[in-house]
Amino acid sequence: MNEPIEVLAAELPRVVRWAGALARQLRRHDIAVGGKHSGSADTDALTLTDLSVQEILVAALRDMGPTVRRCRIEAEEGTGDLGRFAAESEWVLAIDPIDGTREYRDRIGHRYAVMLHARTAETIHYSLVFLPEEDTDGTWLEVRGDRIVLGADDPARTARAVLDALPPVVPAPTRASRRILVSGFLGREAERARAVSATGLDGVLGAATPGSLYPLMASGYLTGALFHTPNVYDFPVCMHVARALGGEAVWVHDGKRVDFRRTWRDERANMIRLPGIVACASDRSALATLVDVAREWSPERYR
């Protein structure tokens, strides 16, 4: 089951570090690109960096050998030698070259990230996230099975050595945070966050948080997330973190465990999404509350 994971864990960190350095440098220039028209400012943001970073990541994955090329690629953008990978495979490698493109493009924050994860239809097996401008030299998040590491980069050492030296995040028996990130409810996010807060949890919007979803989940600042039709490029990392901490991700309409056997293509945004509303939390009691509050909300993204 772990066939590509050994190769990815050994080879990918240095490439992601290089991609992060490129993103830091390109951000100083006029790199905005048009072409997306879904109606969501976050979804429609696109830069030359997204395209360039994906080109690098795909080329590096291609050159890792046949084990990796036998995987299927799901990439947020269309650049790179994607035809070298399997059209059908048990394994999927999902790439978000720049998560948080709008803030990256507009230079209004430092929580953008280079992300990749490996999954099967059942669950996520490996996730790697690098935030180039968090901390002095960037911040790493790696999830491998149930082991999470989170911490600062050190360019004096190899990327793999840095990750190996980071202490694992230990799941707390109970986490003090009740914060739930609410996202994807087009035009209704504030309303949905208030509904979550009315249950005793603390529904928050992305703009009100001090960083990226993924390290905030791993550190315990956020206990979970409630997303409408999340995409398959970045949100699965949130699911992976939650599960590694002893939590879960479920569909709110029936409370069943989320897998990747059912997806749909959002033609407006030109991306693949999970259907319906997904609740994800490291605290399973919070999950039950989220299912109760959101069960009757519309699963349709565009109405």
Segments and roles (model prediction):
Residues 1-98, 295-303:
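N-terminal subdomain of lithium-sensitive/metallo-dependent phosphomonoesterases centered on the IMPase/IPPase/PAP
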Residues 1-14, 194-303:
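Oxyanion/phosphate-interacting regions
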Residues 23, 50, 61, 101, ...:
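Residue-level signal for inorganic ion chemistry
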Residues 76, 130, 228:
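Conserved residues at the C-terminal ends of beta-strands
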Residues 84, 149-176, 254-272:
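Charged, glycine/proline-rich intrinsically disordered loops and linkers
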Residues 85-151:
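DPxDG-like acidic metal-binding loop motif
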Residues 123-124, 148-151, 155-158, 284-288:
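Short helix-loop capping/hinge motifs at secondary-structure junctions, enriched
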Residues 165-208:
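Short loop->beta-strand "edge-of-pocket" segments that line small-molecule binding or catalytic clefts
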